[in-house]
C-alpha cells in the first residue's frame, strides 16, 4: 500500500488528488496523511479516493521563532513516530510527499523508518522542507528545469480547454483561500470592464464573499461571485482571460485549459517563488506578470484590452502534458 502526504492549501492537495486517482485507477490502495489545519479535511475527509485518511495536529515551522519553533519541531518528531504505527498497520511500502507543512510527519517518518520516499516539488523554487528531505528521497519530481512539463493535473482541465478568440469574459482568481488584493483590483476594474461589455467571474474566498457581492451590487455591475468551487474548470471554460496569483497548481491548470492569464504573484511567498513559477511563461510570451507593489490599474486595463489572447491560447495548448500523473506514477511503481 502507498501513502500520500501533504497539503495545507489547494495547490498541494490538487497534486495529491491527481496522483491518488492515477494509483486507484491502477488498482492500488492509497491512504492519506494530512493535517487538521488548512484545507486537508475539506478536500478529503469524505472522499472515496483514499482507503484510509489520517489528519494530525501538525503545524508549519518556517515562520515560527524561538521556543515556538522548537515545540513545532518536537511535535513533528512525535507525529513521525505515530506514522510508524500507520505504516505497520497498512503495510506501507512507499510515501509520496506533495509538500506543505502537512507532509512533514509522514515524510520524516518515511526517512526514519526506511520507507521509500518520493517527493513532488510543485514550485520553481524548492521549499525548505523539500530541500532538507531531497537527499533522502528515492526520487524527486519537479516540472521545472525539464524538457517536458509533466505536472499532475486533473484531466477535466484539458477536457474543458478551448482556444480563445475574443475577450468577452474575465475571471479573477485569488487562489483556494481568496486574495484581498485581487478582490480589490477586480472591483476597481469592474466599471471599466462593464463599459466594454466584458463579463466578470470572480472567486473571492469565503472571508470577503458578502462584502464583494455587495460592492458589485452598489456599482450596478452584474458579476458571478463565489468563494470556492470544486468545479473551477467550468468557470475557466467560460472565460477568455484570467487575472490570478501564480500558485503552481493554479498556473498549470490555467495552462491545461489554454486560458490566457495575467499573473500577479503573491509578493510575500517564500523566495518569491510565485514569480519564478510564472517566469517561463513570460519568457515565452505566453503570459503577462505584474508585481503587486506599485501596480497601475490603468496600465493593466490597457494591457487587458490589447492582449493577443488568441495567440497566447494557441501557444498554451501543448505546453503541459495531459499525462503528468501517469508519468510520475509509472516512475514510482518501477522503483
Swiss-Prot record:
Membrane topology label: Peripheral membrane protein
Pathway per the UniProt entry: Cell wall biogenesis; peptidoglycan biosynthesis
Residues holding UDP-N-acetyl-alpha-D-glucosamine: 9-11, 123, 176, 274
Location(s), subcellular: Cell inner membrane
Enzyme class, UniProt record, top EC level: transferase
Domain of life of the native organism: Bacteria
InterPro entries: GlcNAc_MurG, Glyco_trans_28_C, GlycoTrans_28_N
GO biological process: carbohydrate metabolic process; cell division; cell wall organization; lipid glycosylation; peptidoglycan biosynthetic process; regulation of cell shape
GO cellular component, one term: plasma membrane
GO MF annotation list: UDP-N-acetyl-D-glucosamine:N-acetylmuramoyl-L-alanyl-D-glutamyl-meso-2,6-diaminopimelyl-D-alanyl-D-alanine-diphosphoundecaprenol 4-beta-N-acetylglucosaminlytransferase activity; undecaprenyldiphospho-muramoylpentapeptide beta-N-acetylglucosaminyltransferase activity
SUPFAM superfamilies cross-referenced by the UniProt entry: UDP-Glycosyltransferase/glycogen phosphorylase
Coiled-coil portions: none
Reaction catalyzed: di-trans,octa-cis-undecaprenyl diphospho-N-acetyl-alpha-D-muramoyl-L-alanyl-D-glutamyl-meso-2,6-diaminopimeloyl-D-alanyl-D-alanine + UDP-N-acetyl-alpha-D-glucosamine = di-trans,octa-cis-undecaprenyl diphospho-[N-acetyl-alpha-D-glucosaminyl-(1->4)]-N-acetyl-alpha-D-muramoyl-L-alanyl-D-glutamyl-meso-2,6-diaminopimeloyl-D-alanyl-D-alanine + UDP + H(+)
Alphabetized UniProt keyword annotations: Cell cycle, Cell division, Cell inner membrane, Cell membrane, Cell shape, Cell wall biogenesis/degradation, Glycosyltransferase, Membrane, Peptidoglycan synthesis, Transferase
Primary subcellular site in the record, as a coarse category: membrane
EC number: 2.4.1.227
Function recorded in the entry: Cell wall formation. Catalyzes the transfer of a GlcNAc subunit on undecaprenyl-pyrophosphoryl-MurNAc-pentapeptide (lipid intermediate I) to form undecaprenyl-pyrophosphoryl-MurNAc-(pentapeptide)GlcNAc (lipid intermediate II).
Family the entry assigns: Belongs to the glycosyltransferase 28 family. MurG subfamily.
Name of this protein: UDP-N-acetylglucosamine--N-acetylmuramyl-(pentapeptide) pyrophosphoryl-undecaprenol N-acetylglucosamine transferase
Amino acid at each position: 500500500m502507498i501513502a500520500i502526504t501533504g497539503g495545507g492549501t489547494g495547490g498541494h492537495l490538487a497534486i495529491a488528488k491527481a496522483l491518488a486517482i492515477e494509483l486507484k485507477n491502477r488498482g492500488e490502495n492509497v491512504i492519506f496523511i494530512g493535517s487538521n489545519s488548512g484545507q486537508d479535511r475539506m478536500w478529503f475527509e469524505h472522499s472515496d479516493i483514499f482507503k484510509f485518511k489520517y489528519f494530525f495536529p501538525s503545524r508549519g515551522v518556517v515562520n515560527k521563532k524561538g521556543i515556538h519553533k522548537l515545540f513545532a519541531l518536537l511535535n513533528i518528531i512525535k507525529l513521525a513516530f505515530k506514522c510508524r504505527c500507520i505504516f505497520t498497520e497498512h503495510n506501507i511500502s512507499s510515501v509520496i510527499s506533495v509538500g506543505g507543512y502537512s507532509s512533514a510527519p509522514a515524510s520524516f517518518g518515511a526517512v526514519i523508518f526506511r520507507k521509500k520516499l518520493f517527493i513532488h516539488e510543485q514550485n520553481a523554487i524548492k521549499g525548505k522542507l523539500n530541500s532538507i528531505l531531497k537527499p533522502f528521497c528515492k526520487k524527486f519530481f519537479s516540472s521545472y528545469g525539464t524538457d517536458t512539463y509533466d505536472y499532475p493535473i486533473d484531466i477535466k482541465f484539458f477536457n474543458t480547454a478551448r482556444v480563445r478568440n475574443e475577450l468577452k469574459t474575465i475571471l479573477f482568481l485569488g487562489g483556494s483561500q481568496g486574495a484581498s488584493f485581487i478582490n480589490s483590483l477586480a472591483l476597481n476594474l469592474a466599471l471599466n470592464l462593464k463599459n466594454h461589455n466584458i463579463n466578470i467571474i470572480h472567486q473571492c474566498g469565503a472571508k470577503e464573499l458578502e462584502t464583494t457581492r455587495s460592492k458589485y451590487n452598489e456599482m450596478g455591475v452584474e458579476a458571478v461571485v463565489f468563494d470556492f468551487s470544486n468545479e473551477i474548470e467550468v468557470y475557466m471554460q467560460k472565460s477568455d482571460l484570467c487575472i490570478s496569483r501564480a500558485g503552481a497548481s493554479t498556473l498549470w491548470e490555467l495552462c491545461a485549459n489554454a486560458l490566457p492569464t495575467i499573473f500577479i504573484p503573491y509578493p510575500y511567498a517564500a523566495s518569491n517563488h510565485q514569480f519564478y513559477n510564472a517566469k517561463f511563461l513570460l519568457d515565452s510570451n505566453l503570459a503577462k506578470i505584474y508585481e503587486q507593489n506599485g501596480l497601475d490599474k490603468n496600465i493593466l486595463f490597457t494591457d487587458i484590452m490589447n492582449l493577443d489572447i488568441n495567440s497566447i491560447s494557441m501557444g498554451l495548448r501543448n505546453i503541459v502534458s495531459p499525462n503528468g500523473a501517469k508519468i510520475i506514477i509509472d516512475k514510482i511503481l518501477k522503483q
